[in-house]
Amino acid sequence: ALLDDWRQQYGSFGKARIARTNTRQIGSIFFGGGTPSLFKPQHLARLLEEVPHQGAEITLEVNPGTAEYHRFEDYQDAGINRLSLGAQSFSNAQLARLGRVHQQDETISAVAKARQAGFSNINLDIMWGLPGQSVAEALQDLRQAIQLQPQHISWYQLTIEPKTEFAGRPPIL
């Protein structure tokens, strides 16, 4: 029932937006903000039915620690053509400091599994300015991301948001 409500709201929003902008096609759709890969592929397919998206880049954000690799092919069948993997760092110590549920090897495995499933458009999210991270360590993370040869790398500075664990207990940078 919740999915049907979302689908109706998403479809109504998308159709209204397209009508206002006089655009016939959407160029990019991004399912992000946490762990949208926990959605079943058929649910994503139903959401995508609501808007014209032929030829669009459709991204699904995936946490390497919770990725269900057996679903990667099903995501493609649902219309997802780009995966964005939240690596954040290739240092297991940094990942632990950040409270991440994955380790470096899981990111490397997720990239390999995505390629095996047929994804040819992969993004890696990594961060710099992490607690105690040196410039050399940040650059090492970037080098490791480049070694995996993704089509895109998003290299973000750590941002401490209000009402998060780090806001109440800021890391020493």
Q: How should each PLM-predicted stretch be described?
A:
Residues 1-11, 24-173:
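Conserved non-cysteine loop/helix-boundary elements of the Radical SAM core domain that shape
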Residues 16-23:
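Ala/Thr-enriched low-complexity intrinsically disordered regions
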